[in-house]
Design a protein with these regions (language model features):
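Acidic/polar-rich alpha-helix caps and helix-coil junctions
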Residues: 1-282
C-alpha cells in the first residue's frame, strides 16, 4: 500500500493520502490514466468539500460507505461512479445535467467514419479525445499522423495495419472509457450486438469474462468474506477479488418484446427475435 508518500490525482492535483491521516491507497489505484480518477471513487479516496472539510470514502465491511455504515445503500462491487459530481458538491449542491457533449460527438463521428471505411479519419477523432484526456494517441500504418510522438510528447500506441475490425474495437473501447457513467454503455453494447458475447475479447469485456452482460460479476470483498483470520484485517481483506453476482443475459434481452396484442392486430409485424410465440408462427 502507498503508506509513506502523498498520492496525487493526476487530473485534479489533489492529494489523496496525507501522512498521519490513517488512510492509504492500494498501488492498483495509483498512476492510472486521468479518466479513471475523474470517473471512479475507490477505497479510501479523498474528497475535499468547499476547502473546509475532507472526507474519505471507506467501502470495506465496517467503513463509512460499507455494509455496516450503510446497510441498504452501499456499492456492492467496492467502487462507485463519481463523474457527475464536482469536488465541491454537498448534499444540498446543484449541478447541471449534460445532455450531449463534444466527446460524444467526436466518438459518434469516428464510429460513422469507421463503418464507411474511412479508418484514418476515425482514428484522428479518437486521438482528439485521447489528447484532451491526457493519454497517448494511436498511430497506424495508414493513419493521418505518422510521427512517433503526439503533440504532448507521449509515445504513440502503434496499432499496425488499420483494419475496420481493429478500428471498430478501438472506438468501442474508447466509448466505454470516455463515456463511462453517462448512460451510454447500456445502449451501446446492445446496439453493437455484443451484449451476449460468449467469451470476452479484451476490448469490450475482459478476456477472462464469459457471458457478456451476464455471467460472473466480480468485485472487491465488501462483505469481508473469508477465514476467521482473514476477517480480522477488514481493510486488507477488502482487496480480495470475489464473485459478487451471477447474472443471466440471453440474446433476446437486447430488445424488449413488442406487446403481443399489437402483433395479433397486424400480421405484418414481426416479433423481436427470441420473443416469438406459437401464435406468431401459425
Amino acid at each position: 500500500m502507498l503508506s509513506t508518500t502523498a498520492y496525487k490525482d493526476k487530473f485534479s492535483g489533489y492529494t489523496y493520502f496525507t501522512p498521519g491521516s490513517g488512510y492509504s491507497v492500494m498501488k492498483q489505484f495509483y498512476n492510472r490514466e486521468p479518466r479513471f480518477y475523474l470517473g471512479i471513487t475507490f477505497q479510501n479516496r479523498r474528497w475535499d468539500f468547499d476547502n473546509s472539510r475532507t472526507y474519505y470514502t471507506v467501502m470495506s465491511f465496517n467503513g463509512n460507505s460499507g455494509p455496516t455504515g450503510n446497510t441498504h445503500d452501499y456499492p456492492i462491487f467496492g467502487t462507485i461512479g463519481r463523474k457527475p459530481l464536482s469536488e465541491g458538491t454537498t448534499p444540498s449542491g446543484v449541478d447541471n445535467a449534460v445532455i450531449i457533449r463534444l466527446g460524444e460527438v467526436y466518438l459518434n463521428y469516428a464510429e460513422a467514419c469507421c463503418e464507411l471505411g474511412d479508418l484514418a479519419t476515425a482514428i484522428h477523432y479518437v486521438n482528439l479525445i485521447r489528447s484532451r484526456a491526457g493519454v497517448a494517441e494511436y498511430v497506424g500504418l495508414n493513419s493521418e499522423d505518422q510521427t512517433a510522438r503526439d503533440a504532448r510528447g507521449e509515445t504513440r500506441i502503434d496499432l499496425g495495419n488499420l483494419t475496420q475490425d481493429l478500428v471498430r474495437k478501438v472506438i468501442y473501447r474508447e466509448r466505454i472509457i470516455e463515456l463511462a457513467f453517462e448512460n451510454k454503455y447500456y445502449f451501446d453494447v446492445r446496439r453493437w450486438g455484443v451484449a451476449d458475447m460468449a467469451q470476452g475479447d479484451g476490448w469490450i469485456y475482459p478476456s477472462w469474462h464469459k457471458g457478456g452482460e451476464g455471467g460472473q460479476m466480480v468485485g472487491f470483498n465488501v462483505s469481508n468474506l473469508g477465514t476467521t483470520e482473514e476477517q480480522k484485517n477488514v481493510q486488507m481483506n477488502f482487496y480480495k477479488r470475489v464473485q459478487t453476482q451471477t447474472r443471466v443475459f440471453t440474446k433476446r434481452m437486447s430488445f424488449l418484446p413488442i406487446p403481443q396484442e399489437e402483433v395479433n392486430r397486424d400480421l405484418e409485424i414481426v416479433q423481436n427475435t427470441g420473443w416469438e410465440t406459437d401464435t406468431d408462427e401459425e
